[in-house]
Amino acid sequence: MGGAVVDEGPTGIKAPDGGWGWAVLFGCFIITGFSYAFPKAVSVFFKELMHEFGIGYSDTAWISSILLAMLYGTGPLCSVCVNRFGCRPVMLVGGLFASLGMVAASFCRSIIQIYLTTGVITGLGLALNFQPSLIMLNRYFNKRRPIANGLAAAGSPVFLCALSPLGQLLQDHYGWRGGFLILGGLLLNCCVCAALMRPLVAPQVGGGTEPRGPQRPPQRLLDLSVFRDRGFLIYAVAASIMVLGLFVPPVFVVSYAKDMGVPDTKAAFLLTILGFIDIFARPTAGFITGLKKVRPYSVYLFSFAMFFNGFTDLTGSTATDYGGLVVFCIFFGISYGMVGALQFEVLMAIVGTQKFSSAIGLVLLLEAVAVLIGPPSGGKLLDATKVYKYVFILAGAEVLTSSLVLLLGNFFCIGKRKRPEVTEPEEVASEEKLHKPPVDVGVDSREVEHFLKAEPEKNGEVVHTPETSV
């Protein structure tokens, strides 16, 4: 991709794997929690919005849809901003946008205005926080990156369990307008998290001002060269197919229980079970992925997590009572947590640190399309058949397909491809090929010595340096 470029500074910065990285992890935990839980948490205000504006449930549901679409669909824009201005400034602006959108929504007089404020402005603000926080986390952690990603991903279920009751409490005491205003103030904490994202600085030589190591070539604002990487292409296709069905069961499981005659309170408790299991599944999956013997096979572990999730959906379609749905939510929470902990760790392992900011933006854009297709397609299938199990079968089939795409694509297209020829001197030396004569050529050391000493005019000038003299 042509156009403007930005220099990100010196190379050779080693991930500290701790230190200030724990503060970055804490900030990423909070940002991930807000980003994923907020679109679901605002749903507690939907009934009051329906009464206020005289609209239907489908009209209010667009608020969450627009929030998710902005979170996923603005990925490339976030990548450009991060590569141009850096993570911390982008997150500070994003925190202001997220707060401003909710504060402005508290003064809205129509649902369209809420779409623009809560949906577009707050959604954009959360997107400008979510992606840079992941980029900073992956710059601060290398050896401990899997467990760091798992702990950060745990912010989603933790905040979901906290924000939904908080939203209900605010609505009961202050109404939806007061609740939106207070939530807007709460989102200013994103700016605090942005302040924690301290850029890594290259080490200095002898206290001087010159950074150690070579300068990195200027980086494109949006690096489309990732599409030349077969590993990235396979990951992007698999992730897009996965998202078609991944979010469908949590959307429909409560209605599925109510359709069986389960009371509303018990039906809603299913999501609490799912979220509680998810809290522990994510860091556990990150810890397992970080083990030395497991980490080289993280792509296959991610494929297994997707397969596990799809298989759980298929078995959940056979549930006939509340107990069956409880068992489904337990296993779905485990598999869902594994997927959440591994998805960005695997992407980072595929594309590397330098291309991660562009890669994650492009992947989120592709997933945005799938997010807008998946749950609505499940709803249309439900309207046509009136049978919930078909919705779960469709979701399971989509996630299973994505796991097979990743597994087979990685095994046949990546795992078995020939290793490229070694061109770097350091790599050549490690392969013991440096200065190694062909097998069929014999070398007489006496003739070589005579040639160098007696006939220098045929050989050119011989220069002795401390590095070449023995």
From Swiss-Prot:
SUPFAM superfamilies: MFS general substrate transporter
One BP annotation, GO: pyruvate catabolic process
PANTHER family: MONOCARBOXYLATE TRANSPORTER (PTHR11360), MONOCARBOXYLATE TRANSPORTER 4 (PTHR11360:SF27)
Transmembrane segments: 18-38, 62-82, 85-105, 110-130, 150-170, 180-200, 232-252, 268-288, 299-319, 322-342, 356-376, 392-412
Gene3D superfamilies: MFS general substrate transporter like domains
Family of the protein in this entry: Belongs to the major facilitator superfamily. Monocarboxylate porter (TC 2.A.1.13) family.
Disruption outcome: Deficient mice are born at normal Mendelian ratio, with no apparent defects at birth. However mice exhibit impaired exercise endurance with abnormal neuromuscular junctions innervation and lower compound muscle action potential amplitude.
Topology relative to the membrane: Multi-pass membrane protein
Protein's job: Proton-dependent transporter of monocarboxylates such as L-lactate and pyruvate. Plays a predominant role in the L-lactate efflux from highly glycolytic cells.
Name assigned to this protein: Monocarboxylate transporter 4
Cross-referenced InterPro entries: MCT (IPR004743), MFS (IPR011701), MFS_dom (IPR020846), MFS_trans_sf (IPR036259), Proton-linked_MCT (IPR050327)
Primary gene name: Slc16a3
Keywords of the record: Cell membrane, Membrane, Phosphoprotein, Symport, Transmembrane, Transmembrane helix, Transport
Description of its domains: Two basolateral sorting signals (BSS) in its C-terminal cytoplasmic tail are required to direct SLC16A3 to the basolateral membrane.
A GO CC term assigned to this protein in UniProt: basolateral plasma membrane
Sites bearing Phosphoserine, chain numbering: 430, 469
Annotated PROSITE patterns: MFS
Domain of life per record: Eukaryota
Binding partners and assembly: Interacts with BSG; interaction mediates SLC16A3 targeting to the plasma membrane.
